[in-house]
Amino acid sequence: MVKNLFISVISQKEANRGSVEFQVFSFTNKIRRLTSHLELHRKDYLSQRGLRKILGKRQRLLSYLAKKNRVRYKELIGQLGIRETKIR
C-alpha cells in the first residue's frame, strides 16, 4: 500500500509521526477519500464542509513548509502529486 511505503520513508528520516510531511500525507488521503465519496453523494453538504476544512488545514501546513524548507516542500508535492499553490 502507498501509505505504508510513505510511512516507512518518512520514519526512516524522522521517527516523528507528527511531522508536517506526515500530516500533509494523511490529509491528502482524507481528501481523496472524501472526493470519491462526494462523487457518489453530491448533496452531502456536511462532507463538503469537512472537505473544505481539511483542504484549508493542508494548505496552511503546505505554506508553512514552503516558508521553512523549500526543498522538502518541493519533494513532498512531487511525491503526493499535488499542484503548487499560487502565491497571493
From Swiss-Prot:
Q: Which domain of life is it from?
A: Eukaryota
**Gene3D superfamilies noted in UniProt:** S15/NS1, RNA-binding (1.10.287.10)
The UniProt entry, under CDD domains, shows: Ribosomal_S15p_S13e (cd00353)
- UniProtKB keywords: Chloroplast, Plastid, Ribonucleoprotein, Ribosomal protein
The UniProt entry, under Pfam families, shows:
Ribosomal_S15
Annotated Gene Ontology cellular component terms? chloroplast; ribonucleoprotein complex; ribosome
Does the record's keyword annotation contain Membrane?
Answer: no
What InterPro entries does its record include? Ribosomal_uS15, Ribosomal_uS15_bac-type, uS15_NS1_RNA-bd_sf
**Main localization, broad class:** plastid
Its annotated compartments are: Plastid, Chloroplast
Q: Which GO terms fall under biological process for this protein?
A: translation
Gene Ontology molecular functions: structural constituent of ribosome
Oligomeric and partner information: Part of the 30S ribosomal subunit.
**Family label:** Belongs to the universal ribosomal protein uS15 family.
Q: What is this protein called?
A: Small ribosomal subunit protein uS15c
Which organism is the protein's source?
Answer: Vitis vinifera (Grape)
Q: What is the lineage of its organism?
A: Eukaryota, Viridiplantae, Streptophyta, Embryophyta, Tracheophyta
What gene name is given for the protein in this entry?
A: rps15
